[in-house]
Design a protein with these regions (language model features):
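Thiamine diphosphate
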Residues: 10, 16, 20-31, 39, ...
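Extended active-site and interfacial segments that coordinate phosphate-rich ligands
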Residues: 36
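Long, structured ligand/cofactor-binding scaffold of large enzymes
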Residues: 1-4
Length: 276
């Protein structure tokens, strides 16, 4: 808040992003809410990238905005502290990275489509869930959401323009335009509180289900795998959420979904991590 008040420019890097990334620190350091706090600061541009090319595009854009265009903004970027492969940047995704969302991987199939969205460390869980679902004949595509905050701000700006023009101008939010190019229910999973990704619910294309997974509750000291299982943001819970939404819309039978329970180790009697 002090940086915003002083009109600072620069990059603030949160190097222990997410509730499950810095495992073993428990209540002391696990962060599931900093992006929500960042959203309260008007001149703070925040991102939760996963891959090195996303970070590069964001930093390049920040340098241009702050030091070439002289915009009075500063950046809050969360980074991770675990080792994983970093792919080459797909073609044509720069604008999506800057604005907050792009399709990382489109399913080759078309049967039972579902859209999986993720950010930060949990994007890799989302990618693993998509692979499992594809093996089950589910056309699961993956979206990288670099900034739910920026998507929300864009959506609110579009709503404001429509309001003040009495409907004469009705710009479409960027996230709406992107997701309209897909079909099926949408599942979002992040390493932050559910409220972070739930911000864009008003801008989900009409008639589409939107299921949000997040890390509400106090941090714990454990392995990353155990923490993600505890907060229900591991790949198994992402896959289960996709199956549940497909069942609700009638494209997956209840019996077929129930057959997944043992395979994914989904416990219906598990205590809610928000209170446990």
């Amino acid at each position: 808040w002090a940086a915003g008040d002083m009109q600072c420019q620069g990059f603030l890097i949160g190097a222990t992003s997410g509730r499950t990334t810095l495992n073993g620190e428990g209540l002391q350091h696990q962060d599931g809410h900093s992006h929500l706090l960042a959203s309260t600061i008007p001149n703070c541009i925040s991102y939760d990238p996963t891959y090195a090319y996303e970070m590069a595009v964001i930093v390049q854009d920040g340098l241009k905005r702050m030091y070439e265009k002289k915009e009075k903004v500063f950046y809050y970027i969360t980074s991770l502290n675990e080792n994983y492969p970093h792919p080459a940047m797909p073609e044509g995704v720069e604008e999506g990275i800057r604005r907050g969302i792009y399709r990382l991987r489109e399913s080759a199939g078309t049967d039972k489509p579902v859209q999986l969205m993720g950010s930060g460390s949990i994007l890799r869980q989302v990618e693993k869930a998509a692979e499992w679902l594809n093996e089950k004949g589910i056309a699961a595509s993956v979206w990288s959401v670099t900034s739910f905050n920026e998507l929300r701000r864009d959506g609110m700006a579009c709503e404001r323009e429509a309001l003040l023009s009495a409907g004469q101008r009705t710009p479409e939010p960027y996230v709406t335009a992107q997701l309209k190019q897909s079909e099926g229910p949408l599942i979002s999973a992040t390493d932050h509180m559910k409220a972070y990704s739930d911000q864009i619910r008003p801008y989900i294309p009409q008639g589409r289900a939107y299921q949000v997974l997040g890390t509400d509750g106090f941090g714990r000291s454990d392995t990353r795998d155990a923490l993600r299982r505890f907060f229900e943001v591991d790949w198994q819970h992402v896959a289960w959420a996709a199956g549940y939404e497909l069942m609700k819309e009638g494209t997956l039978s209840a019996d077929e979904l129930e057959s997944w329970r043992e395979q994914l180790s989904i416990d219906a009697s598990k205590p809610d991590p928000l209170y446990s």
